[in-house]
Amino acid sequence: IIENYDKLDKHFDVSFMSTINSLNIGKFTQLKKDIGHRKWNQGSVIVNNRPYTLSAIPDDVKEIYLNDCFEFGMIGLINYLEDSVYDEKVMTELMQHCKRRDTLRGTYLPDVFPEWKKYYEKT
């Protein structure tokens, strides 16, 4: 992906664009490291697509994400996280949805998002 970006960037005005949801917000600091100096628009927050809203993030997971965001000075993400209010029902829906997808794909969510393991296993 990075290689393709660099090829296109020589001829076009390109940038990375990503939505922000309850799972990927925890990977944005890694994404920032990976894309380096390249243009990146953090995108829009998922607000009406339950269960992927930020309200699915339990407080202990949110704390991990906030620490990462503070380290990188990602003020917009910090504000989104701080403004979100945890809703256990939404989190349970998210974990159930992820489990169904994992069954179909032969994947395991905690392999990519280990901070969610106790919630995934409990659901």
Residues of each region from the PLM?
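Radical SAM enzyme [4Fe-4S]-AdoMet core and its adjacent flexible, acidic
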Residues: 1-123
